[in-house]
C-alpha cells in the first residue's frame, strides 16, 4: 500500500507539472489574410469579368469575355483534358515517339526531350565515371608541408662544436638573430 501511495503521488505531481504548463506563443504572427473578393451576379451585371479592377490584379483580356469581339479570334483551341508542353527547342523535338522496325508509337507531348534548363549531370547512370571529390578541409584535406629548418637556426655562439651536441634544444628564430 505504501508503494502505491508513493507511486500515485509521484504520478499526480508529474501530471500536474505536464498539464499546467503554458503554451509558448510564437513571437512572429503573420498579418491576417484578406478574405477573397466574391462577386455576385448582381454586382457584375453585364460587364465582362476582365474589366473588373476592384482587387487590382492585372488580367489579360480574353476574347471570350469581350462584349463586341467574337470568340472565334482565339486561334489556340486547347483541350482541357490533355496536357500540353511548350519547348524552346525545335518543334520536331516536342513529339516524343518510340520507333521500332515495323511501326511508330506516339506517346504524346507530355514528355519533352530537351526542355529542361539548368539541370546538372551527376552521372548516376554511369557509376564507373568518378565524380570530382571536394578538396576543402572538412571533406578531403590537403596536407600542408612547412619547412621549419629554414626559419630556425642553431644558437649563435662562438663555440659551434659544443652546440652540435645540443642542436635540438637551442633553436631560435632567424628573425631574432640578424647577421
From Swiss-Prot:
O-glycosylation is important for the antibacterial activity of lebocin. It comes from Bombyx mori. Hemolymph. Produced in fat body. The keyword Signal applies. This is Lebocin-4. One of its GO terms (biological process) is innate immune response. Residues 17-120, 153-179 form a propeptide. It is found in: Secreted. Glycans are attached at residue 135. It comes from the Eukaryota. Keywords: Antibiotic, Antimicrobial, Glycoprotein, Immunity, Innate immunity, Secreted, Signal. Belongs to the lebocin family. Antibacterial peptide. Its main location: secreted. Residues 1-16 form the signal peptide. Induction: By bacterial infection.
Amino acid at each position: 500500500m505504501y508503494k502505491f501511495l508513493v507511486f500515485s503521488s509521484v504520478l499526480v505531481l508529474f501530471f500536474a507539472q505536464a498539464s499546467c504548463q503554458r503554451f509558448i506563443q510564437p513571437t512572429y504572427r503573420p498579418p491576417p489574410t484578406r478574405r477573397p473578393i466574391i462577386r455576385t451576379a448582381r454586382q457584375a451585371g453585364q460587364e465582362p469579368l476582365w474589366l473588373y479592377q476592384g482587387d487590382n490584379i492585372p488580367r489579360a483580356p480574353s476574347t471570350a469575355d469581350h462584349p463586341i469581339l467574337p470568340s472565334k479570334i482565339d486561334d489556340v483551341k486547347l483541350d482541357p483534358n490533355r496536357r500540353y508542353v511548350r519547348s524552346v527547342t525545335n518543334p520536331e523535338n516536342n513529339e516524343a515517339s518510340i520507333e521500332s522496325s515495323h511501326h511508330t508509337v506516339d506517346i504524346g507531348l507530355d514528355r519533352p526531350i530537351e526542355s529542361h534548363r539548368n539541370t546538372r549531370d551527376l552521372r548516376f547512370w554511369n557509376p564507373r565515371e568518378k565524380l570530382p571529390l571536394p578538396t576543402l578541409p572538412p571533406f578531403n584535406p590537403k596536407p600542408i608541408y612547412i619547412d621549419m629548418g629554414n626559419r630556425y637556426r642553431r644558437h649563435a655562439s662562438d663555440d659551434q662544436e659544443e652546440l652540435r651536441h645540443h642542436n635540438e634544444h637551442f633553436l631560435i628564430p632567424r628573425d631574432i638573430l640578424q647577421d
